[in-house]
Amino acid sequence: MTVPLRVGLVAGEASGDTLGADLIHALRRLAPQTEFFGVAGPKMQAAGCEVWEPSESLAVMGLFEVLRDLPRLVRLLGRIRDRFLAVRPDVFVGIDAPDTNLRLARRLHAAGIPTVQYVSPQVWAWRRGRARSMRESVDLVLCLLPFEKSFYDEHGIRAEFVGHPLADAIPLEVDRPSARRALGIDSNAQVVALLPGSRRGEVSRLAQDFAATARWLAAQRPDLVFVAPMASPAAREIFAHALELHAPGLDVRLIDGQAQA
């Protein structure tokens, strides 16, 4: 009887959740019995990943937010690390979020667990010294951009170019009429997209400013149509509350995902 491959995953935000779900689907096509577990978002969970902790628990941004949440994050990462060490997956894949995942990968790698970083940190642009520490943390880097592989080859780190998922998701030629029909927007409307981000803390900090700006624009141009893609139910709730407080009565169409449209 073949023992199924066991893959540990950590995705720290909405974009990582999308990448993780695509990875799960791709691996399942090759090895249908593969088991997935770790820190995941709703898309990864729907794809079949056992969720130890939700991705949003790691999604913090900004110095104040990090300092405020530091004790909680340290405890959380300690629990995740210890659980991976106890379960010992066949491979650990950290998806984006390099500050979190490379630190975790170093501990797991030292314990003999193969480690992969999916999405290269921008070591080719700044803090190039991180490449040395990556040699001690990861066995493989999966790169979204073709030139990144060459950089890692030069630094003695195994890497593979796997392509950027948006290359498949976004057409080369945008069909604006179809996109507007899908969103229920008149073909001649002047549309303003409100994009407050995907992280809970990010949306919390920016939602009031977005709402106030939309209210001001609507006062100047009553014909404008506002559309706001929401990365998660939590982001939708936060943004809707900000609109109620700071732009009451303003018609803003909150849509789930579909930022590419």
Which residue ranges define each predicted feature?
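Nucleotide-activated donor-binding/catalytic signature segment of Leloir-type glycosyltransferases, i.e.
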Residues: F239-G257
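Loop-centered beta-sheet repeat module
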Residues: A231-H241
